[in-house]
């Protein structure tokens, strides 16, 4: 007979930061009686999820991938943004073997170098400085046909801010004497991660066939036309950009295609559409035989050269739990499932022994402000059942609402999202109390606490650099101040009576009173 477990649950409230300023602060304005009560009754503090504390450049806002890697690994992990920017500054980037091979193969075949990625200074999924370095390197190596397929942001940047980036790259190509912007499309289409293949297919057809809803002779003109159609950057319809002869640039046999996003979750689907021989997400009219390179590792089953392979993280929380014969559950909606599994496990796809996973489908709506509660009720039902089963030592759960609805810029919807999560937490805490369990409530980064850009007056759809909550609902304890996300895994191990491995440099934040 299996011994009943007294589970320790880590509840990650995605996009839930703390901000003193209450103006357009959806979390402050939401009615959250459960969290209010827990903060009044139990020890709590604020911890850091941004900048140097998570291995990002100083002042850089945190994000979900980075947050979960730090949460699960128990150490500050040097992030891809910093790593690649350093390689560019040190002139190592221009000698990267995978990138050089791709450019050289296209030149040798008489083909073109196609560069695609999120053209943004946001630093969450990509950085336009990396894309510029790639364009410069391609031309320096002798490429005369260099085509940029720009995915537009408006989510980790202000909703209408792409013009300066497009103008800069127009000027860059003029200076280089070769290359041009070949297409633009919003990230809503090109970077879907929820198996909405009808969106991804529009980006694929744009790049491979030049098939587009609109066609212009200049990228800035195309963007301005999109704004006239009331499309913000994120939602810009497929737009092919023609050359002086009215021709579009499409991916052909013998070309190279270099994907410049460094974050994996929103890069996987479109990558698979280009390289998987048995791909069945949508009908591909053409499948060019080309040299495809990814900037970083997107998934174990994606077989393509990688410019910057992942650094191997050992003795993450999941691995330590496995070694100690502990059971664990990972649970979230589609939107954050990769975060509580792949990213939390330090970039490992396969579950650890004793690790179960539950995926709840996110609602099929165009944007989550249309259903701010998302699938939180179903998620909570499954989570409560798992707690009551007493099968698990540790449960990792992510509620995506604060982040996913925060990204829409819709204040009223974000308030509803926060209220939905609060009600769910009440159910979870009650279930834990029944079985003698405990929980830590925290977040990976901020978002919903700032819904308007105080400078521009536009909707603030990006993450923030605010501190995030850290609450312990359990035994009588004290909590250290000044913590960061990498302190969470060591804290969990201490609470369940396991030793902290040497690889974890984080410190336990919770101290049980004797």
UniProtKB/Swiss-Prot annotation:
Residues annotated as binding substrate: 125, 155-156, 187, 193, 263-266, 336
Broadest EC class assigned to this enzyme: isomerase
Residue ranges the record marks as coiled coil: none
InterPro entries: Alkaline_phosphatase_core_sf, BPG-indep_PGM_N, Metalloenzyme, PGAM_B_sf, Pgm_bpd_ind
Gene Ontology molecular function terms on file: manganese ion binding; phosphoglycerate mutase activity
HAMAP family xref list: GpmI
Self-association and partners: Monomer.
Protein name: 2,3-bisphosphoglycerate-independent phosphoglycerate mutase
């Amino acid at each position: 007979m299996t011994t009943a477990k007294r589970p320790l649950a880590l509840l990650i409230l995605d996009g839930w930061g703390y901000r003193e300023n209450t103006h357009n602060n959806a979390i402050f304005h939401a009615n959250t009686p459960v969290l209010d009560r827990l903060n009044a009754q139990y020890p709590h503090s604020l911890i850091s999820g941004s900048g140097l504390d998570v291995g990002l450049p100083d002042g850089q806002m945190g994000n979900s991938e980075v947050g979960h890697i730090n949460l699960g690994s128990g150490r500050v992990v040097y992030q891809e943004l910093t790593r690649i920017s350093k390689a560019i500054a040190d002139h190592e980037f221009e000698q990267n073997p995978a990138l050089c091979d791709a450019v050289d193969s296209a030149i040798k075949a008489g083909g073109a170098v196609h560069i695609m990625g999120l053209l943004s200074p946001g630093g969450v999924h990509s950085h336009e400085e990396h894309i510029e370095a790639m364009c410069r390197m391609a031309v320096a190596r002798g490429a005369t046909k260099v085509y940029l397929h720009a995915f537009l942001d408006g989510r980790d940047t202000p909703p209408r801010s792409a013009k300066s980036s497009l103008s800069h790259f127009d000027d860059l190509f003029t200076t280089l004497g070769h290359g041009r912007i070949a297409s633009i499309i919003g990230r809503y289409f090109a970077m879907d991660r929820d198996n909405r293949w009808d969106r991804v297919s529009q980006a694929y057809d744009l790049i491979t066939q030049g098939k587009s809803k609109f066609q212009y002779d200049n990228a800035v003109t195309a963007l301005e036309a999109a704004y006239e159609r009331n499309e913000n950057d994120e939602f810009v319809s497929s737009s092919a950009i023609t050359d002086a002869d009215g021709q579009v640039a499409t991916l052909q046999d013998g070309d190279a295609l270099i994907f410049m996003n460094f974050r994996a979750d929103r890069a996987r689907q479109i990558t698979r559409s280009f390289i998987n021989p048995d791909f069945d997400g949508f009908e591909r009219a053409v499948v060019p035989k080309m040299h495809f390179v990814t900037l970083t590792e997107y998934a174990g089953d994606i077989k393509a050269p990688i410019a910057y392979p992942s650094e191997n993280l050992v003795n993450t929380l999941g691995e330590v739990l496995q070694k100690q014969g502990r059971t664990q559950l990972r649970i979230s909606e589609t939107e954050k499932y990769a975060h509580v599994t792949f990213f939390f496990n330090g970039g490992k796809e396969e579950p650890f022994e004793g690790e179960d996973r539950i995926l709840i489908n996110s609602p099929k709506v165009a944007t989550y402000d249309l259903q701010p509660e998302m699938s939180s009720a179903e998620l909570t039902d499954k989570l409560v059942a798992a707690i009551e089963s007493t099968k698990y030592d540790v449960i990792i759960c992510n509620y995506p609402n604060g982040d996913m609805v925060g990204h829409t810029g819709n204040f009223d919807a974000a308030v509803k999202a926060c209220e939905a999560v609060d009600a769910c937490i009440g159910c979870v805490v009650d279930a834990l109390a029944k079985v003698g369990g405990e929980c830590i409530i925290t977040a990976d980064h901020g978002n919903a606490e700032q819904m308007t850009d105080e400078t521009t007056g536009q909707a603030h759809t990006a993450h923030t650099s605010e501190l995030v909550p850290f609450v312990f609902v359990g035994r009588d304890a004290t909590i250290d101040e000044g913590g960061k996300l990498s302190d969470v895994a060591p804290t969990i191990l201490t609470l369940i009576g396991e030793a902290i491995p040497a690889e974890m440099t984080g410190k336990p934040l919770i101290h049980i009173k004797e």
